[in-house]
């Protein structure tokens, strides 16, 4: 661990505007890249943080920069390009921030009169299409996604936007997450909110697996189920959800979106982020929906207040749903990711890090068929391998206490986030391993493999380097869960060192090779591997 007098290294260069690499550059390979590993590693994240004299406030606000590593027969090339969203083009043309983002309110056009600038406060805000969170797939096509109603369809070879898609033109939702789930046949599931006279609802969305016509996007999408928010004007914020073979699991957590503050944010001169608050006086609730019928199950499952961004996996066993989540006990971390905080150095940076809640993996068990005659105060979980409990209360609610899927050694790694599994074979199934980033800094500074059965860790770390979310790619035809490789983009603020694509053997968690590119890259969010 860091000693008491050793400050965290400054990472400001990882959170500054980068240049595009429009022409593919060949990487210098050290070690070896497996010959069978042929495809694209696609990643996205914020890559431009100012226009003219205007500066973004929050890390999440930066313009989407698309990254592509192409692997073919042991060689690797890299290129990148800013997503040509309407927001990016409007800001570029105006030479200023024209469209507001999560943590930055666009100021009125300085060329307008004082009266015009005042009146512009009362005009409805333009929703950003700066989709900088993840690559997602619908009907075989790839889209850039965030949490608004807009997605951008992209040509993954050229990194060019081909179409802008609005969820609200197809179904009655005001957005959708950047973390959909997929059935083996390609059917996609997602979640999005809707707002109406009766308050706010959380909607389960289903998108068909295939196109009926060549030009289709998300045609045929439908709302499978609508779940009323516990508080009409304060729905919960969520970033992902869980899915098993038969059920969708939604976690309604006490991070609240105050709709009135969000609606009036422009008038009040505040960004969207001002309307989000951590309210731990509320407990966390789990909602379970049958994927096949759209029926919301009657079980009322509650737990302590916590924040989760990413679910790890969920599966069914002995009449229960088991769901594993990365959890924080304090939900105020969103505000800490102001760029002025992330770019600090020395004691100031240390103080920001100390305020950040650490994220740890926890397992919850939700018994599905609870008899009205079930005894109060009794643990209803039959799972001998988990210490997670589900206890019926006097009011019929079921109180769920989690099992920690870690030992003290994970605390020394700063917790874990950006969890990934062998999704193609083990999503929605009982599994043994997941992979993530350790956080001894404000961004990931290690890669970790967790064995959820015995809670042991394997760790990869290189001092002064910061790895991205790990992506698991299975060996073709492999039977074992961890037979494959881990891909991660590893970057450094040290200008004399090269950034690189790291390839780890997933089983031993040792390095097979790396592909170095002398290109500046900002720290990003999510990505995916696409075989070719």
Curated annotation (Swiss-Prot):
Reaction catalysed by this enzyme: all-trans-beta-carotene + O2 = beta-ionone + all-trans-10'-apo-beta-carotenal; 5-cis-lycopene + O2 = 5-cis-10'-apo-lycopenal + (3E,5E)-6,10-dimethylundeca-3,5,9-trien-2-one; 13-cis-lycopene + O2 = 13-cis-10'-apo-lycopenal + (3E,5E)-6,10-dimethylundeca-3,5,9-trien-2-one; lutein + O2 = (3R,6R)-hydroxy-alpha-ionone + (3R)-3-hydroxy-10'-apo-beta-carotenal
Cofactor requirements of the protein: Fe(2+)
Description of what induces expression: Up-regulated by carotenoids.
Phenotype upon gene inactivation: Homozygous knockout mice lacking Bcdo2 develop normally, and both females and males are fertile when raised on standard diet. On a diet supplemented with xanthophylls, knockout mice accumulate derivatives of these xanthophylls in all tested tissues and develop liver steatosis with large lipid droplets in hepatocytes and a significantly increased triacylglyceride content. Accumulated carotenoids impair mitochondrial respiration, induce ROS production and cellular signaling pathways related to oxidative stress.
Binding-site positions, Fe cation: 179, 239, 310, 526
Coiled-coil residues: none
Protein name: Carotenoid-cleaving dioxygenase, mitochondrial
A GO cellular-component term linked to this record: mitochondrion
One Pfam family recorded for the sequence: RPE65
GO molecular function annotations of the record: 9,10 (9', 10')-carotenoid-cleaving dioxygenase activity; beta,beta-carotene-9',10'-cleaving oxygenase activity; metal ion binding; oxidoreductase activity, acting on single donors with incorporation of molecular oxygen, incorporation of two atoms of oxygen
Chief location category: mitochondrion
InterPro entries: Carotenoid_Oase
Summary of the function given for this chain in its UniProt record: Broad specificity mitochondrial dioxygenase that mediates the asymmetric oxidative cleavage of carotenoids. Cleaves carotenes (pure hydrocarbon carotenoids) such as all-trans-beta-carotene and lycopene as well as xanthophylls (oxygenated carotenoids) such as zeaxanthin, lutein and beta-cryptoxanthin at both the 9,10 and the 9',10' carbon-carbon double bond. Through its function in carotenoids metabolism regulates oxidative stress and the production of important signaling molecules.
Free-text tissue specificity from the UniProt record: Expressed in small intestine, liver, kidney, testis and less abundantly in spleen, brain, lung, and heart.
Compartment annotation: Mitochondrion
Annotated source species: Mus musculus (Mouse)
Keyword tags: Dioxygenase, Iron, Lipid metabolism, Metal-binding, Mitochondrion, Oxidoreductase
Cofactor binding description: Binds 1 Fe(2+) ion per subunit.
Main EC class the enzyme belongs to: oxidoreductase
Recorded family membership: Belongs to the carotenoid oxygenase family.
Keyword Mitochondrion set for record: yes
Lineage: Eukaryota, Metazoa, Chordata, Craniata, Vertebrata
EC number(s) stated in the UniProt entry for this protein: 1.13.11.-, 1.13.11.71
GO terms (BP aspect): carotene catabolic process; carotene metabolic process; carotenoid metabolic process; lutein catabolic process; lycopene catabolic process; regulation of mitochondrial membrane potential; regulation of reactive oxygen species metabolic process; retinal metabolic process
């Amino acid at each position: 661990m860091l000693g008491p007098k050793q400050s965290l290294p400054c990472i400001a260069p990882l959170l500054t505007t980068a240049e595009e690499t429009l022409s593919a550059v060949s990487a210098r390979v050290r070690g070896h890249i497996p010959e069978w590993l042929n495809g694209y590693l696609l990643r996205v994240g914020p890559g431009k943080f100012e226009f003219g004299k205007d500066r973004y406030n929050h890390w999440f606000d930066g313009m989407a920069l698309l990254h592509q590593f192409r692997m073919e027969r042991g060689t690797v090339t890299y290129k990148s390009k800013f997503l040509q969203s309407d927001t990016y083009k409007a800001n570029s043309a105006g030479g200023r921030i024209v469209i507001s983002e999560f943590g930055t309110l666009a100021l009125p056009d300085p060329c307008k009169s004082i009266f015009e600038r005042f009146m512009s406060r009362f005009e409805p805000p333009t929703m950003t299409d700066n989709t900088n969170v993840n690559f997602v797939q619908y009907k075989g096509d790839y889209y850039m996604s965030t949490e608004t109603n807009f997605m951008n369809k992209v040509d993954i070879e050229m990194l060019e936007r081909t179409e802008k898609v609005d969820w609200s033109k197809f179904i009655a939702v005001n957005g959708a997450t950047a973390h959909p789930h997929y059935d083996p046949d390609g059917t996609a599931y997602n979640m999005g909110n809707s707002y109406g006279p009766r308050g706010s609802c959380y909607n389960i969305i289903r998108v068909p697996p295939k196109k009926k016509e060549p030009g289709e996007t998300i045609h045929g999408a439908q709302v499978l189920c609508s779940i009323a928010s516990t508080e009409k004007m304060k729905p919960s914020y969520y970033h992902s959800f869980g899915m098993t073979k038969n059920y969708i699991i939604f976690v309604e957590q006490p991070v609240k979106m105050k709709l009135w503050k969000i609606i009036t944010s422009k008038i009040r001169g505040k960004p969207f982020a001002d309307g989000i608050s951590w309210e731990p006086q509320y407990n966390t609730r789990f909602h379970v929906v049958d994927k096949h019928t759209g029926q919301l199950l009657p079980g009322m499952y509650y737990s302590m207040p916590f924040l989760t961004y990413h679910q790890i996996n969920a599966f069914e066993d002995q009449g229960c749903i088991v769901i594993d989540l990365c959890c924080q006990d304090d939900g105020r971390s969103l505000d800490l990711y102001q760029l002025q905080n992330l770019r600090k150095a020395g004691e100031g940076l240390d103080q920001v890090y100390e305020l950040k809640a650490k994220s740890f993996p926890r397992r919850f068990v939700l018994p599905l068929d609870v008899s009205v005659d079930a005894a109060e105060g009794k643990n209803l979980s039959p799972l001998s391998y988990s210490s997670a409990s589900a206890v019926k209360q006097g009011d019929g609610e079921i109180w769920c206490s989690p099992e920690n899927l870690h030992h003290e050694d994970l605390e020394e790694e700063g917790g874990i986030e950006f969890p990934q599994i062998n999704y193609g074979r083990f999503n929605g199934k009982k599994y043994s391993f997941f992979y993530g980033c350790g956080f001894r800094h404000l961004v990931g500074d290690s890669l970790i493999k967790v064995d959820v059965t015995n809670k042991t860790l394997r760790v990869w770390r290189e001092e002064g380097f910061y790895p991205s979310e790990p992506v698991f790619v299975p060996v073709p035809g492999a039977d074992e869960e961890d037979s494959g490789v881990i891909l991660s983009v590893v970057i450094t603020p040290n200008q004399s060192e090269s950034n690189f694509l790291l390839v780890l053997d997933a089983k031993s968690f040792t390095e097979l090779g790396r592909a170095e590119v002398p290109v500046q890259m900002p720290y990003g969010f999510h990505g995916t591997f696409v075989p070719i």
